[in-house]
Each structure stands twice: as structure tokens, then as C-alpha cells.
Regions:
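Residue-level detector of functionally pivotal "anchor" positions at catalytic/ligand-binding pockets or at interdomain
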Residues: 552-573
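Active-site-proximal helices and loops of the catalytic beta/alpha 8
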Residues: 15-31, 41-50, 60-73, 95-103, ...
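Aromatic- and acidic-residue-enriched carbohydrate-binding clefts of CAZyme catalytic domains
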Residues: 21, 64-96, 127-177
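Bacterial N-terminal signal peptides
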Residues: 1-9
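Substrate-binding cleft of carbohydrate-active enzyme catalytic domains
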Residues: 86-128
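Boundary/entry segment of secreted carbohydrate-active catalytic domains
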Residues: 15-38, 169-180, 460-464, 469-471, ...
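C-terminal tail/sorting-segment detector
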Residues: 584-595
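Aromatic-rich carbohydrate-binding modules that target alpha-glucans
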Residues: 466-517, 529-535
Length: 595
């Protein structure tokens, strides 16, 4: 008994991913998914998501100081969680709703690098539960950005760390020195907060090649997440070495699995599923250390870095046979991570695949056995729980394959894929019935809400945002002959507008107030990857995506220029008028006529 008790703590150490885990994860975003990945919108889909997914990986959820996918992280602690995907309250509500429906939420954790506030070396000061957290210039790696950070720090009379980066450098932002006690203190507090305050169940660590895996071990042993997966984008041996460096406190994405699927689908040669990719077996393959790293493999066939984004940013996407690729993904060991765009396009079929996977009892440690391979199709048998097995056949002629035993019974099929099962009757497998996801609809303009007001002398504008434009709207304003940076003092997309409330039609209304004494000539509003056209600025103007609708300043009365009231008078475009001529002006937030 004493021996068992002595060994117990060792067996209970933080494990990067549970053994024999049968769950499936959704990547709940894609690049520039500012509308589809809104916290409030995801929450409305929870009933459908909970039929299929056990985990949902969300984009980095902190305020990055502008419209962002979150990889230029700025703030880490509560009070700064109004992001491009929603408010802090909406995020907390989403995580809570997911939890009540049996879904765990995975946080995207970006700690390789961090954005600065105003220069090369300053970081925000944040107070959480009475403790102040702030990274210093001395927390930046000595060789950051080829020594440029050190040079810039010196110009300010500051210094950087004496420690060089423990991983690959990246010039986009400041690489953090994870040997620093202060960095470790900040990161540990941040991770504990994500788990214990927001309610995340685990982490997806971004760009883990940027710092030594020993620090992921340090952080995971301290915070003890239920799930941890790192983005180690490299060969299988490099990924294995990183997993080992973490003390197996973290799983990793199986990039070589993804590449073998891409090779097969894009080339129309399904025998490539049985081949290496540039000398690399996938982590889940029996050819890679006899499959002993399957537990730590999070498999996928597409993500935000490989997807097709546009004609000028094509990346390295699956170009065809998305369904067959997902059928293979969801039949194989490892923990599958389904890409949001694939789920959106094929909800019912992917849900059916997952239902069969779970009914058979396939886990991250199940054993696959190839049954047939040629250019037209690939067949693989995967052992589930007990005597149950799944036979997955994918390829252009998947339907032509005939199982070698009558014990196999077809359960589902589709374009270039077939699932057979044995040891379980297809009739006992319940396929989910998904609901139609509610599609947000913008309301028609029906007047200015009462909460829209203009202060005396205030230069401002209002914007009624489409529902799909996200929860943060930005304002870009400029003078003729200049640009927004000249007028606003910042780059695109400009200055964040303030959310005032919700109009009667359900659209959110934002207000922007100029910090200048002179009104701009033009204005643009943007959010969620969308923007208005260039519009003429009208002070107090109430705009929507189609342009100026009306002016918030209501009421009109006649006054004389010599009535004795010293209140300032402004032109309709917001300029102070010292000696008004006859015409219409603004005074005390009202339109007035001077005759």
C-alpha cells in the first residue's frame, strides 16, 4: 500500500493530454473570422456544437489595442478583455454556457512575444486581485530582432536582458526572456487566471519553437491545465523532442498528419496516406516510435495558417476532397481538431462521422491497421473499445472497395468516403439531428436612439453597426490633403469608437469623439473585417454601413446674432464660427437659423 501511495503523485503529474481520450475538438475560428467567431454568435450555436465537440479552441481573447486575431497580444488580465470577438462579459458567458453543455474551452496562449504600448520596450501595467503585473525592458531577450530592441532600449536609457533567446527569434514583436523571474511570475499568474477566473480548461500555446520546451513544462506543472497543446510547426522528430522537453506535460499538433492528407487529397493519390511526408511519419502512425506518441497528437487537416484566405494569400490549403479528409481525420487515433470552415460547410456529415467514432470507442491511443492502399482509395481499420472496430475508406473510388469480412456493415457514406463498423450494429448508432443555426439579421434604420447626444462644442459622429461587424468599431478620419494618421495620431484602423447601446432594431450603436478642435473632412468606420466607403464627415452625423442617415442634433429655432448669449456657434461640419453670417448653425446642440 505504501508503495502505491508513494507512486501516486508521479502518476498524477500534469499530463499534456489524457490517455485514451475520446473527445473531439473544434478550432472555433479562421483567419479574419471577426463575425463568425464572435463570442455571442458562438454561444447561440452551443446546442449544435455540443452534439459533436468536447473542446472548442478560441482565438486569443485579450485586448490587443486594435482589430486583431490576437497574435499581437498586449493585455493579459481582466479589465482588458474587450477584443475583436466581443466583450469580456460575452466571453465569460460563452465559456460558462459551453461548460454547462459539456464543452471545455481552450485558450490560445501567446507568450513567445508581446506587443508594446508606445515604444520598443514598454509593456502595460495591469493590476489583478491587488497585485500589479508588468513586464520590463529587461524581460526582452538580448538578441531580440537581431539586436534592434537592445539598440532602441539604449536610446531610452534602458537595457534588455543579458540572456539570449532560448528558441527561434521573431522580429514582429518583443521576444520574451523566459529565464526571467519576472516573466515567469507574470506568465504563471496569467495562466492561473485563465483557468480559475475565466474557466478555460486548457491551453493552445502559440509558436512554441520560439522558446525552450522546458518553460512549457514549468508553466504547466504550476497551473495544471487539463489539456495543453503546442504549435510546434516542424518535422515529427522536432515535435517529439519538444514534447519530451515539456516532460510530456503538453501535446502537440501533428503537422505531418496534416501534410500526408494534403498530399493525398490535392494530388488525387490516396496511397500517399500510407507514405511519409518528406521523410516524416505522422505522430499517430505506427511507423513513428511504434505509435507511442499518439496520446500527445492533436490531428488536423486545415487551420488558420494553411487555409485559403484570398487570391493573394492562398497559403497551403486543401483544394478538394474536404469531406474525405475529415472522414480520415475522424477515424484515426490522436485527438482530431476540426477546422471551423469545414464544420460550417459540412455540419451534418461531420457530426455523423464523430457520432460513429464515439460509438465505436475510438480514442487518441487506438491502433490503426491499413487494409488496402492504391491511388484510387485507402482503407484503414481502427480498433475501438471491446470488439468494436471502424473501417474507413477514402478516395475517388472508395465505394469500389469491398471489406474482406461479412462482419463489416456500412454505417455512413458520402462523397469519396465510406464508414463500416463491426462489433456494433449500425442501428444502435444514433446520428445527431442538428438545428439550423440562427443567421444574424441587421435591422432596418428606424431613427436615432435617445442615448445619442452631442455635447457643447463636441466634434463627433455615430455609427450603427451591422451585426456581423463584430463588437468593436474603429474610426478613421482625415482632412483633405492629409490622412488618418495625421489627424488621429495613429495608424489604420484608427481609433476605437465607444459602444453606447443597442438600437431598437437590434444593431449596436457606437460614438466617436474627436480629440482635435478642428473637424475632419472625411470618415470611415470599420469592424469585423468590413468597412464603409469614404464618407463626408458631418458633425453629429448618424451613419450606418450605407452612409449618413440623419443628424443627432435635433430641433431648429431662429435667433438673432445679437441676442447676448455667449455660447459658441458652430457650422454644420463642426467648425467654430466667430462671426456668423445668415444661415443654419449649431448652438447648444441645436440647429438654429441666424437671419
Amino acid at each position: 500500500m505504501m508503495l502505491i501511495l508513494a507512486l501516486l503523485p508521479l502518476s498524477m503529474k500534469a499530463q499534456g493530454w489524457p490517455q485514451d481520450y475520446g473527445g473531439v475538438m473544434l478550432q472555433g475560428f479562421y483567419w479574419d473570422s471577426f463575425a463568425d467567431a464572435q463570442w455571442s454568435r458562438l454561444e447561440k450555436q452551443v446546442d449544435n456544437l455540443s452534439t459533436t465537440f468536447d473542446l472548442v479552441w478560441l482565438p486569443q481573447s485579450g485586448d490587443c489595442g486594435g482589430q486583431s486575431m490576437g497574435y499581437d497580444d498586449l493585455y493579459w488580465f481582466p479589465g482588458h478583455y474587450n477584443s475583436s470577438f466581443g466583450t469580456e462579459a460575452e466571453l465569460r458567458s460563452l465559456i460558462k454556457t459551453f461548460r454547462t453543455k459539456g464543452i471545455g474551452t481552450i485558450a490560445d496562449v501567446v507568450i513567445n512575444h508581446r506587443k508594446n504600448v508606445s515604444n520598443w520596450v514598454d509593456f502595460p501595467k495591469e493590476t489583478y486581485k491587488g497585485v500589479t503585473y508588468q513586464l520590463l525592458s529587461t524581460d526582452i531577450c538580448a538578441d531580440d530582432d537581431g539586436g534592434k530592441a537592445k539598440t532602441e532600449a539604449s536610446k531610452l536609457g534602458l537595457s534588455v536582458s543579458s540572456n539570449k533567446d532560448t528558441g527561434e527569434g521573431w522580429g514582429g514583436m518583443r521576444d520574451l526572456d523566459h529565464k526571467s523571474t519576472n516573466v515567469q511570475t507574470n506568465v504563471k499568474a496569467y495562466l492561473h487566471m485563465l483557468l480559475e477566473d475565466f474557466g478555460y480548461v486548457g491551453f493552445r500555446y502559440d509558436m512554441v519553437k520560439g522558446y525552450s520546451g522546458e518553460f512549457t513544462k514549468l508553466y504547466n506543472e504550476d497551473s495544471k491545465p487539463q489539456f495543453s497543446v503546442g504549435e510546434c510547426w516542424d518535422s515529427s522528430n522536432t515535435i517529439k523532442n519538444w514534447i519530451d522537453a515539456t516532460g510530456k506535460t503538453s501535446a502537440a499538433f501533428d503537422f505531418q498528419f496534416r501534410y500526408t492528407v494534403r498530399n493525398a487529397a490535392n494530388n488525387g493519390d490516396w496511397s500517399k496516406l500510407a507514405a511519409q511526408n518528406d521523410g516524416n511519419w505522422p505522430l499517430v502512425s505506427s511507423g513513428f516510435f511504434t505509435g507511442s506518441y499518439r496520446q500527445y497528437a492533436v490531428t488536423f487537416v486545415e487551420n488558420h495558417d494553411t487555409e485559403y484566405r484570398s487570391a493573394t494569400a492562398q497559403q497551403d490549403p486543401l483544394r478538394k476532397d474536404t469531406l474525405a479528409a475529415n472522414a480520415y481525420l475522424l477515424a484515426m487515433p490522436g485527438t482530431p481538431c476540426v477546422f471551423m470552415k469545414h464544420w460550417q460547410a459540412y455540419k451534418q456529415e461531420i457530426a455523423n462521422m464523430v457520432a460513429v467514432r464515439k460509438a465505436v470507442g475510438i480514442t487518441n491511443m487506438s491502433k490503426p491497421t491499413p487494409m488496402a492502399t492504391n491511388k484510387e482509395y485507402y482503407a484503414v481499420q481502427v480498433a475501438g473499445s471491446g470488439d468494436k472496430k471502424l473501417l474507413c475508406v477514402v478516395g475517388t473510388k472508395a465505394e469500389d472497395y469491398t471489406p474482406t469480412s461479412a462482419a463489416w456493415k456500412k454505417v455512413i457514406s458520402g462523397y469519396h468516403y465510406v464508414y463500416y463498423v463491426s462489433g456494433i450494429e449500425p442501428s444502435v448508432i444514433t446520428l445527431p439531428e442538428l438545428q439550423e443555426d440562427e443567421q444574424p439579421q441587421d435591422g432596418e434604420f428606424n431613427g436615432v436612439p435617445s442615448f445619442c447626444t452631442v455635447g457643447d462644442g463636441e466634434i463627433c459622429a455615430f455609427f450603427e453597426a451591422p451585426i456581423t461587424w463584430g463588437s468593436q468599431i474603429y474610426t478613421w478620419a482625415w482632412m483633405k490633403g492629409g490622412d488618418g494618421k495625421d489627424y488621429l495620431g495613429t495608424g489604420w484602423p484608427g481609433v476605437a469608437a465607444t459602444l453606447l447601446g443597442t438600437a431598437d432594431n437590434g444593431n449596436k450603436v457606437f460614438k466617436w469623439t474627436s480629440a482635435n478642435t478642428t473637424a475632419p473632412d472625411n470618415i470611415i468606420f470599420s469592424g469585423g473585417g468590413s468597412q464603409t466607403a469614404d464618407m463626408v464627415f458631418e458633425n453629429g452625423g448618424y451613419y450606418n454601413k450605407d452612409g449618413l442617415k440623419t443628424n443627432v442634433i435635433t430641433g431648429i429655432r431662429t435667433i438673432s446674432p445679437n441676442h447676448g448669449d455667449a455660447t459658441n456657434i458652430y457650422s454644420l461640419d463642426g467648425r467654430l464660427v466667430r462671426q456668423p453670417k445668415p444661415g443654419i448653425y449649431i448652438r447648444n446642440n441645436k440647429k438654429v437659423v441666424i437671419r
